[in-house]
Amino acid sequence: MLNVKSKINTILHRPSIVKSILYKRNINEIRSDLDKIENYEARQFISYLKQSFPYESNAFQRPKLNRLCSLEDWNNDEIRQILSELQMLTHPIIIHRKQWEWAMGILAMKRFNKLNDKCRAIDIGAGREEVLFYLANHLKHVYATDLYGELDKWDKSAPSTFLNNPRKYAPFPYKEDALTVLKMDGTKLEFPSETFDIAFSFSSIEHFGGRNHEGAFQSMKEIERVLKKDGIAVIATECIINDKDDPEFFNKKTIYSDLIDKLDSLKLVEPLDLRITNKTLDTVMDIETAANWDNIDTSFRETHPLILLRSRTILFTSVMLVFQKK
């Protein structure tokens, strides 16, 4: 759950809302006013960022690995090729940041010559992600780990039925003997040290709990342990782009202080670029709409990229972190 402090602070700094509460104004009207104020604040920040720090990405250049998601990436040939292999280049294309996480993860594996039938991989917080079936067709073996069926709020993403019947969820044929699904805590990986060539996780570690993202850090320490020397960790997580704090999502400070700077043998393969392009800033969408994405009319999804999200006054998107074990 996103931090409620931003909501409380917004109320306390808006006398009109406080007055409405004191006079017992209709709660739905109060919520509506609050949302308008929070939306205004978020869009003011976007306007400031676009004017003060304009940034455009060249879709024809070789993509960097460690960075924020950009709308322009869907025009990059390398990324489009991977999306095509994942059968995600629909016509017209529907743009979703989850596609980007998977494509960038595969791109990193290719760059480091790990996408082959000699490499073993582990997915932490795997759920029932479609990328698992793609990787099972390209790697020696993939282990998908998650708390399947244990947490009600994640039952749709990590159903207990995936444990025994992953084939039911496969979008295309895959090597069934190359995928093993295990119920396992991402902060306590039940494997010997130096077992895997690849460890990957897509928008999961931020949900592992603990103060100062302790759960995410413990998961990364376990990844550090089970990776072989020169193995790679491909991690997508959520990053706040404005000056806000949250107990789950990282921001531009805590992604270093609570994660990157605390690791020992895992090192970023290149500097992290936390700039966001102007075109990506234009895609901002409220989180309630995004949460209902699968039920939204196709025509809306075709014209509204799901990349940058707003929850209250918090603006966040996906960030890719690629590490190598030294």
Each PLM stretch: what is its role?
Residues M1-E56, A291-S299, I314:
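Membrane-proximal basic amphipathic "stem/tether" segments
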Residues S57-N116:
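Class I SAM-dependent methyltransferase Rossmann-like catalytic core
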Residues L115-G127:
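Conserved class I S-adenosyl-L-methionine
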Residues I122, E129-K188:
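Class I SAM-dependent methyltransferase SAM/SAH-binding core
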Residues M184-A199:
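A short acidic, Gly/Pro-enriched loop at the edge of an enzyme's catalytic core
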Residues E214-K229:
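A short glycine-rich, Lys/Arg-flanked "PGG" loop and its adjoining helix->strand segment in the class I
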Residues D230-E238:
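Conserved beta-strand signature within the Rossmann-like core of class I S-adenosyl-L-methionine
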Residues K244-K279:
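Conserved Class I S-adenosyl-L-methionine
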